[in-house]
Amino acid sequence: MATMVAGISLRGPVMSSHRTFSVTKRASLPQSKLSSELSFVTSQLSGLKISSTHFISSSAPLSVPFKPSLQPVARRICPFTGKKSNRANKVSHSNHKTKKLQFVNLQYKRIWWEAGKRYVKLRLSTKAIKTIEKNGLDAVAKKAGIDLSKK
């Protein structure tokens, strides 16, 4: 059997019948078929812009400067007193120490704000609630630097 390698015909195995297989010249593809395939590819890409001078002349930076994201809303910190979680040791009977967190006793509390003539819902520690009852909401908020009109 004859095989085709790079356009050259090879003779098959020579046995009792000395047959030779010759391969005729390969017919080239017609130009119209090639151009139609090319136009199909270009029509698929017709909506895309490959290059543009609009971005080159622009003086605006390509990257956006990094802005840190907003802090999480439900942090375990009292905004009025600044109390945070305490890292303590959990001590077993065998005196084996492991770290644990002692959280602040935070409570959601709706407090009447006299200057604003409305209720303000705050997340406060129990110590801050006692301080507000003693000194007043305006005095404690002013000392902590908190604007109650945004709450």
Swiss-Prot record:
One of its GO terms (molecular function) is structural constituent of ribosome. The keyword Ribonucleoprotein applies. Belongs to the bacterial ribosomal protein bL28 family. This is Large ribosomal subunit protein bL28c. It holds the Pfam family Ribosomal_L28. InterPro entries: Ribosomal_bL28 (IPR026569), Ribosomal_bL28/bL31-like_sf (IPR034704), Ribosomal_bL28_bact-type (IPR001383), Ribosomal_bL28_sf (IPR037147). GO terms for cellular component: chloroplast; ribonucleoprotein complex; ribosome. Keywords: Chloroplast, Plastid, Ribonucleoprotein, Ribosomal protein, Transit peptide. It is found in: Plastid, Chloroplast. Part of the 50S ribosomal subunit. One of its GO terms (biological process) is translation. It comes from Nicotiana tabacum (Common tobacco). The keyword Transcription does not apply. Residues 1-74 form a transit peptide. Its main location: plastid.
